[in-house]
Structures are given as structure tokens and as C-alpha cells.
């Protein structure tokens, strides 16, 4: 008998919206989780083709090695460039997104083999990369701009850098328009969990 594919759910939202927190809650409730942004970061220091492409785009100085010989990448330097030069960001995305998609396809196959019912794909850039076409449902995590900015700064970003990242992403209203579910993360963790639980129960009705 052919393995049944899991329900494929995208989780996205602007910087500081809280999508990682939502995904952690969904994972606790029983969903499988594919972290596209984490995979992309791993590719930047592990995949030879990606490394060569990044060196070509940004120069070899964005890479260094620590005392043990481990390859390191200067993400701050790259971020400062790509959020000021949209064409560089587009080129970086063209380099990385096909490989992230390949990794996602492999994860879908694993979930199908193991009988997992719901696979959530967390990605900061979902619609922009056309990744929504591979998915059955989309969850957008939203919060007001002031709160999102404060959260980004609390994570260590300079205020101006956080603003640039917000401006480089799709407007939140545009994301909300294309979502199957919208989770508003403007309140307490308990209020957030209650919304996530409602969405999870709705997803279960699709797979049962």
C-alpha cells in the first residue's frame, strides 16, 4: 500500500511575530517540524556549492575558521548587505531555496514512511519563495509592528537593522490575506497557546 502523505502546513510571519514559538507549541501537540531557516543556515556552512556561491556573491572574507577548523560565516555582514541590496538577497535566495526544498521533500517522504499525520514547515520567507505551492494549509503568525520591533531588538538586533528586515519582508497584511489561519501573538503565552490549540484541532479534522 502506498504511504499516505502528511498534511503539509506552512507557518510563516514577519520578524518578531513569534512563529518559532507557535511551531514549538505545534510540535508539543504532535506535529512534525521542518525548520527551513535552520536548514538554510546549515547549508551555508556545510554545502560546498552554496559556500562557493556565497563567496562569489559576498567575497571570501565572509567565511573564517575557528581554532578547531570549523567553518564560520559572518551572518551580520551578509545581513547588512542583503537587506540594503535587494538584488543580492534575491541571488542568495535563488542559491539556497532549491536545496531547502529538496531537504523538505525528503522530510515529507520520511513522514509518509513513518505514518506522521501533520508536517509543519516554519519559514520566514514562504510566499516569496513560492514554497506555498507545495503546502496544503498556511498559518500566518501576526503581531503589531511595535511589538515585533521590540522583540527583534530584544533578540540582539540593532533597531535600524530590525526595521530594515521588516521592510524587506512582505507586509503583514499581505501575508494575512493569503493565510488559511491567522494567529495573533499580541497577548500572553496562554492566549497564544489557546489559539494554537484551536488551529491544531482544525488541522486534525482535515487528516482524520
Swiss-Prot record:
Entry-linked Pfam families: CoaE
This protein's UniProt keywords: ATP-binding, Coenzyme A biosynthesis, Cytoplasm, Kinase, Nucleotide-binding, Transferase
Binding-site residues, ATP: 16-21
Enzyme class: transferase
Gene3D superfamilies: P-loop containing nucleotide triphosphate hydrolases
Record bears the keyword Transcription: no
Pathway: Cofactor biosynthesis; coenzyme A biosynthesis; CoA from (R)-pantothenate: step 5/5
Domain of life: Bacteria
Coiled-coil intervals, chain numbering: none
InterPro entries documented for this protein: Depp_CoAkinase, P-loop_NTPase
GO biological process: coenzyme A biosynthetic process
Cellular component, GO, one term: cytoplasm
EC number(s) stated in the UniProt entry for this protein: 2.7.1.24
Compartments, record wording: Cytoplasm
Reactions this protein catalyses: 3'-dephospho-CoA + ATP = ADP + CoA + H(+)
Chief localization: cytoplasm
GO molecular function, one term: ATP binding
Matching PROSITE patterns: DPCK
Family: Belongs to the CoaE family.
PANTHER family: BIFUNCTIONAL COENZYME A SYNTHASE-RELATED, DEPHOSPHO-COA KINASE-RELATED
Primary role: Catalyzes the phosphorylation of the 3'-hydroxyl group of dephosphocoenzyme A to form coenzyme A.
Protein name: Dephospho-CoA kinase
Organism: Chlorobaculum tepidum (strain ATCC 49652 / DSM 12025 / NBRC 103806 / TLS)
Amino acid at each position: 500500500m502506498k504511504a499516505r502523505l502528511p498534511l503539509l502546513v506552512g507557518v510563516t510571519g514577519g520578524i518578531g511575530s513569534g512563529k518559532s514559538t507557535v511551531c514549538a507549541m505545534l510540535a508539543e501537540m504532535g506535529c512534525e517540524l521542518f525548520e527551513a531557516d535552520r536548514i538554510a543556515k546549515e547549508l551555508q556552512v556545510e554545502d560546498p556549492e552554496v559556500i562557493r556561491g556565497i563567496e562569489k556573491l559576498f567575497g571570501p572574507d565572509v567565511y573564517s575558521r575557528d581554532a578547531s577548523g570549523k567553518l564560520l560565516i559572518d551572518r551580520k555582514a551578509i545581513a547588512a548587505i542583503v537587506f540594503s541590496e535587494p538584488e543580492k538577497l534575491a541571488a542568495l535566495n535563488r542559491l539556497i531555496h532549491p536545496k531547502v526544498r529538496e531537504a523538505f521533500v525528503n522530510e515529507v517522504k520520511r513522514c509518509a514512511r513513518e505514518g506522521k499525520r501533520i508536517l509543519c514547515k516554519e519559514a520566514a520567507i514562504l510566499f516569496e519563495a513560492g514554497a506555498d505551492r507545495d503546502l496544503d494549509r498556511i498559518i500566518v503568525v501576526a503581531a503589531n509592528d511595535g511589538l515585533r520591533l521590540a522583540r527583534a531588538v530584544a533578540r540582539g538586533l540593532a533597531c535600524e537593522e530590525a526595521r530594515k528586515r521588516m521592510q524587506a519582508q512582505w507586509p503583514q497584511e499581505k501575508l494575512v490575506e493569503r493565510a488559511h489561519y491567522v494567529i495573533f501573538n499580541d497577548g500572553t503565552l496562554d492566549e497564544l497557546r489557546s489559539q494554537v490549540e484551536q488551529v491544531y484541532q482544525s488541522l486534525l479534522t482535515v487528516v482524520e
